[in-house]
Regions:
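Short helical patches
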Residues: 4-7, 122-124, 130
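Short Gly/aromatic-enriched secondary-structure transition segments
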Residues: 94-107, 111-113
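Non-catalytic accessory segments of hydrolases
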Residues: 108-111, 116, 123-128
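Hydrophobic residues on conserved beta-strands that form the core of alpha/beta folds
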Residues: 80, 105, 150-151
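Surface-exposed acidic, glycine/proline-enriched linker/cap segments
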Residues: 130-138
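N-terminal pre-domain segments of enzymes
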Residues: 35-78, 82-84, 91
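Accessory beta-strand-rich segments of carbohydrate-active enzymes
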Residues: 38, 44-49, 69-70, 84-88, ...
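Bacterial Sec-dependent N-terminal signal peptides
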Residues: 1-36
Length: 208
């Protein structure tokens, strides 16, 4: 019997992220060149992330698999929908203790996931296909980039007990760090590609 279950999440636009599944993730970028920042280090592009694999979905019944309707599978739980969100134009203005489970989000904005935050009124949309919108100086980021901090809660279905749980991101733009219940799970820089993390040991009974 298949022993995996999947939390599906599709994010189409983050510059970078920090996800804390209670659920929170926020975008990170730019600081001084003198610091050896993870997001400016080309040798560090991921950690604690599942290896890439062919796309698949989990189903209990053959008919559901043939029809390929993920909403019919009890082994998948979508996190798409309304999330709490804070936008900051630079890392200096971003939330520093975003991963704390007791951090109140009552005054946060909301955002629809999946989506680009620019088309929901945060930041400025950039449309450019022939050259950079900044002077490239790899691996350093010499200009401020926006930070998006996302959060939402969910409850793990009871029939998932004893199974491994993967958190699946369909797409993230840029650098992302993922947190669950206040604990850092992993990191990815593979922009616009799926990213999965095994969050089994970070979950708890009831609300996460």
């Amino acid at each position: 019997m298949e022993t995996l279950t999947t939390l599906y999440l599709m994010i189409n636009r983050l510059f970078s992220t920090l996800l804390f599944l209670s659920c929170l993730f926020g975008g990170l970028s730019q600081t001084a060149k003198a610091q050896n920042n993870e997001w400016e280090n080309p040798t560090k592009y991921e950690w604690n992330k599942e290896k890439p694999h062919a796309d698949f979905r989990l189903y209990e019944r053959t008919d559901d698999a043939v029809n390929d309707n993920p909403q019919k599978s009890s082994w998948q739980y979508s996190l798409n929908g309304t999330w709490k969100f804070v936008y900051a134009p630079s890392i200096a203005e971003s939330i520093k203790d975003f991963y704390c489970t007791d951090l109140s989000d009552n005054d946060w904005d909301t955002i629809t996931v999946p989506s680009n935050w620019e088309i929901q009124g945060f930041g400025e949309p950039i449309i450019r296909n022939i050259q950079y919108v900044f002077s490239p100086n790899p691996p350093y980021i010499d200009v401020d980039n926006p930070v998006g901090t996302y959060r939402r809660t969910f409850t793990v279905p009871q029939n998932w007990q004893g199974r491994e749980v993967l958190l699946h991101f369909g797409s993230i733009s840029g650098y992302a760090r993922i947190y669950v219940n206040g604990q850092q799970v992993g990191m990815t820089k593979a922009s616009k590609t799926p990213a999965e993390f095994n969050v089994t040991n970070y979950l708890k009974k009831g609300e996460n």
